[in-house]
A protein has these predicted regions:
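Extended non-catalytic domains of envelope/secretory-pathway proteins
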Residues: 1-233
Length: 233
């Protein structure tokens, strides 16, 4: 059963927020709005700058922090920038700052051992650009066709990654079908079908919201939900 919760909170002028996306409410009830790649990348890492607005007033929500993993296909280009024993792939992400958890890649070869590293160029105040290591792995295959994964321990700050494979004295691997796995989460709130609503994000200096909805957080998270739809920015 949905808790008794006001569907509007304080008024808000969204001028300080960098981005907004329309939210489509298709059914009345408790809503679950999953953040898109653009929203989760554009919002603060703690989600404290997220605001739902309807007719100039905030819509109170709670955050469902259960991690959801989604997959995107990036734009990838092989390059011989280093030559020699290394193969280098440039990976273009769809948005800057996407919280990538790992890369997944296919290869037809069934017997190999390779060290792989993922890096990105970062601007350092007063020092120009430096290459930062975001993650790496040691790939092994001994006749099987297991998935090739590269976990990232540091999230990208930009939208360009560099994958380097150390081939040793072996022929390069025929890597293909690159996938980017990223983490996202959802907002839970009450709304009526057709409510005109927008999600605002991208305001690093604002305080996190404090809604009365926090008092019924467990009830909201446990309630039956319908999926709201987040449109492209």
């Amino acid at each position: 059963m949905a808790p008794d919760l006001a569907e509007s909170a304080a008024a808000l002028d969204p001028k300080g927020w960098r981005w907004k996306s329309a939210v489509r409410i298709e059914k009345t009830g408790v809503q679950r709005l999953e953040l898109s790649a653009a929203a989760v990348a554009g919002a603060r890492s703690d989600g404290g700058d997220l605001r739902l607005l309807r007719d100039g007033r905030q819509v109170p929500f709670v955050v469902d922090r259960r991690t959801v993993y989604r997959v995107l296909a990036p734009t990838v280009k092989a390059t011989d920038a280093e030559g020699g024993r290394n193969s280098v792939w440039e990976i273009q992400l769809p948005v800057r700052g996407l919280p990538v958890s790992h890369l997944e890649i296919d290869a037809p070869e069934k017997l190999f051992s390779r060290r792989v590293v993922v890096e990105e160029n970062r601007n350092v105040p007063g020092a120009g650009t430096e290459r930062a290591v975001l993650g790496g792995a040691q790939w092994f295959r001994r006749g099987e066709t297991t998935r090739l994964l590269v976990p990232l321990t540091i999230a990208p700050s930009g939208d360009r990654l560099r994958l380097t494979v150390d081939n040793g004295d072996n022929a390069p691997l025929a890597l293909a079908n690159f996938r980017v796995h990223y983490r996202t989460y959802a907002l839970v709130f009450k709304a009526k079908a057709g409510d005109p609503m927008t999600l605002h994000y991208g305001n690093p200096g604002v305080n996190a919201p404090a809604y009365d909805a926090a008092a019924v957080e467990s009830e909201l998270l446990a309630a039956d939900k319908v999926d709201a739809v987040l449109e492209s920015p």
